[in-house]
């Protein structure tokens, strides 16, 4: 994807996450996952635009005995300002997808806290760039 395509996808995901978190949907597990993928696309746009990096996945891999950094590594290295928020969104997204987290009555609260804190913090960082 190009930088512009990543930005377009990020904005699309941002709007979708808002809709998933309100009635009649209230699918907080998916809303949390989409919040994460919104920030992921801003991250990928940034890595491509500023460092010419296209991550191969979330986590590091090994190829011929050499460690290949993953997106999570690149965030810590190149975007330390949002690393904590990104990691929390990443973890929450994984829990939502693979552990069925956020399906119960507390799902709304978890979604709102992630949206209003970690997501808002990371999103504000990219808004400073006009994104």
Predicted regions and their residues:
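Terminal alpha-helical segments
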Residues: 1-131
């Amino acid at each position: 994807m190009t930088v512009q395509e990543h930005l377009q996808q990020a904005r699309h995901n941002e709007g979708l996450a808002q809709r998933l978190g309100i009635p009649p949907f209230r699918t907080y597990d998916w809303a949390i996952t989409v919040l994460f993928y919104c920030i992921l696309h801003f991250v990928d746009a940034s890595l491509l635009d500023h460092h010419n990096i296209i991550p191969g996945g979330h986590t590091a891999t090994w190829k011929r005995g050499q460690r290949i950094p993953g997106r999570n590594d690149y965030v810590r290295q190149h975007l330390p300002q949002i690393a904590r928020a990104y990691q929390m969104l990443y973890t929450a997204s994984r829990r939502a997808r693979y552990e069925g987290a956020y399906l119960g009555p507390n799902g709304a609260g978890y979604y709102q806290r992630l949206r209003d804190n970690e997501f808002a913090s990371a999103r504000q960082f990219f808004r400073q760039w006009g994104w």
